[in-house]
Amino acid sequence: MSLIPSFTLGKPALLFELSIGKNKLSFDPLIRFALDGKPWSFVFWWRYKVLTEGKFRLHVGAHPAINFRTIPVSINNETRDIQQVCRYLATEVAPSIMISKNFSLGMYYLYSRGLEEDATKTTHFVTVNGSISQIKITKDVFLKVAPPQLFYLMLDNEDGFFSNATLTLTKQNCPFSVSSVLNKSITANISSSKSFVWNISLLYSFNQKYLRRG
């Protein structure tokens, strides 16, 4: 599933997420491939945490991105599939407020600009969301719940309202977790979106810290 939950590759995919940073600035690349080896998208986020103390939090970010899509072309009277590259530039703003130790409310806004002639020129993506940090199921198994979020999506002259929820099951001291995202349209006239989209993911997380010496 993509950053905007209404869209999906439609088949199994492999995702690589990395975060490299110091203090408030981080570089967060997100690389996606289909399991047949074809690239799906490369997103190169730069993020800055403006406010990190107190109840109110704020981060901003920007990225260049490359999306790949397969299109048929005619070569020497033969139809072949080729990979077309679409380039995008985007920026994000994400304020949130901590209601309690394990619960927060926030919103998220993303603006994207397509650079190709046949790509979506402008994208507006706005969400209102909440997060419950941990629900203890057993001694070392926890469920993280993102309560249903509402979001508005506008792609050029098409738009719609959607709802979305995320569940993540984790085990203490285990690098593997299982996550599922469910997305349902409320009212939409976006031709490329689907009425209902869901996925299930197996996640592997590693935490490696490096110290700069000298």
Predicted regions, residues:
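A generic beta-sheet turn/junction motif
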Residues: 20-24, 134-138, 169-173
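Outer-membrane beta-barrel initiation region
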Residues: 1-22
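Membrane-spanning beta-strand positions in outer-membrane beta-barrel proteins
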Residues: 26, 55-57, 104, 142, ...
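Transmembrane beta-strand segments of outer-membrane beta-barrel domains in Gram-negative
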Residues: 122-141, 152-156
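Transmembrane beta-strand segments of Gram-negative outer membrane beta-barrel proteins
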Residues: 1, 20-22, 27, 60, ...
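One face of beta-strands
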Residues: 16, 27-29, 40-42, 141, ...
